[in-house]
Amino acid sequence: GELGEVSATIPLIESLREDRNVDVRVRAARALGRLGGREVVEPLVEALNDENPQVCITATDALIEIGDVATDSLIESLDSEKVNVRCDATRALGEIGNPKAVDYIIKMLKDEWVNVRIYAVTSLGKLNDTKAVPSLIEVMQNEKENDLVRAGAAAALGVLRDQRALLPLRELIMEAEELGELEDTALKSFKKIMAANWQAIPGAQ
């Protein structure tokens, strides 16, 4: 896979799809990621359904390495019935960073599986689009939501550094009976946003 020759992709795709040996499939996925190109995207996306988690993880990393070309296929994978495929696609889209993915990842905040929602809040921070701010605030404020998801949303708001998050973050910290991981994350994000926006905040100078 080091040479980057297109002719090398065909046997590698066959190995990824058909070889019964897990190590062979893992190596094929890794090599296809290095080779890149549009023609390797579909077989790698298919490999997100592999029965072996290591193959799925390697295929995800390969798609991240390929980058933008994989965006549309990964967006389609967000509709998969398999939880791990939705997780892997959500993670990969955050790492690739194409702004086209933002609206689709916002929808994943409503996924029934907590792991998908954790990847979604993290990816929205990485995608760095302030369009996600209202949805992230809503998740953070939702007391019925899992604390890891809420903390992830608070952390993402700190990355986005949007002033709209200041009041909700402050309320979360002030209303807490005790400072746990969620409140600690909210406090860190509050400080980050204040530091980034202090000149624009009335009375902060």
Language-model-detected regions and their locations in the chain:
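Phosphate- and divalent-cation-binding pockets in alpha/beta enzyme and binding domains
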Residues: 11, 135, 168
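TPR/TPR-like (Sel1-like) alpha-helical repeat modules
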Residues: 167-178
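Alpha-helical repeat scaffolds
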Residues: 202-205
